[in-house]
């Protein structure tokens, strides 16, 4: 999976290999701007051990092969569910993070990455449980959170994350991309 063209400059700003990693990132962007793709590329780059010159996952190593299906060091939580099911992220989903990070990594020194999409859909109890994970992050584990709007988030969650505003394509960028596809 690669970035959209309008995300490339932002990737260089976020570039996880250019700085010391923070334990939690909050990526903010509007619906339809490719925020989930950006978050997935970020998560993949934290797990891949053979990054490209552009500091993205290589797509070829064993870790990348697993990422294309289900990687044992990546947990994705989202409010996307079966029709008729709850559209909120439950406290149980957040509590499972603790169990996930307690499992040993499949490789020595491997990172555990938790990607939570649409965190504004956390229940109140789930938000409080997430806060516990943010306050006491396990070693070698990283949280990537996505949100369209931070106004409904607990200020304490926001304050414990490195916030990053994902880019929105201009009308020209969007047209060019769609024509190329």
Task: Please annotate each region the language model reported.
Residues 172-181:
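AAA+ P-loop NTPase domains with strong preference for DNA replication initiators
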Residues 27, 116, 130-131, 147:
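Hydrophobic residues in beta-strands of the RecA-like P-loop NTPase core, especially within AAA+ ATPase
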Residues 102-105, 128-145:
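Conserved catalytic/switch belt of AAA+ P-loop NTPases
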Residues 1-119, 142:
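P-loop/Walker A NTP-binding region and its immediately flanking N-terminal helices
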Residues 122:
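Conserved TIR/SEFIR loop-to-helix hotspot centered on a Trp-containing motif
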Residues 78, 163-173:
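Conserved AAA+ ATPase "SRH/arginine-finger" region at the nucleotide-binding site
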Residues 125, 129-134, 149-162, 179:
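Short regulatory helix/loop adjacent to the ATP-binding pocket of P-loop NTPases
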Residues 118, 149, 170:
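A generic "binding-loop/recognition-motif" signal
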């Amino acid at each position: 999976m690669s970035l959209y063209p309008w995300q490339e400059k932002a990737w260089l700003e976020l570039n996880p290999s250019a700085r010391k990693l923070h334990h939690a990132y909050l990526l903010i962007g509007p619906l339809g701007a490719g925020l989930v793709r950006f978050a997935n590329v970020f998560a993949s780059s934290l797990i891949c051990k053979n990054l490209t010159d552009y500091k993205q996952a290589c797509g070829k190593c064993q870790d990348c092969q697993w990422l294309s299906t289900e990687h044992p060091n990546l947990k994705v939580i989202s409010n996307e569910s079966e029709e008729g099911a709850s559209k909120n992220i439950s406290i149980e989903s957040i509590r499972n993070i603790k169990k996930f990070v307690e499992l040993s990594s499949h490789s020595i020194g491997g990172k555990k990455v938790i990607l939570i999409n649409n965190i504004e859909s956390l229940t109140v109890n789930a938000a409080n449980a997430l806060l516990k994970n943010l306050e006491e992050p396990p070693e070698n584990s990283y949280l990537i959170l996505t949100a369209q709007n931070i106004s409904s988030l607990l200020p304490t969650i926001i304050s414990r994350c490195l916030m990053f505003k994902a880019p929105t394509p201009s009308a020209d960028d969007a047209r060019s991309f769609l024509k190329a596809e």
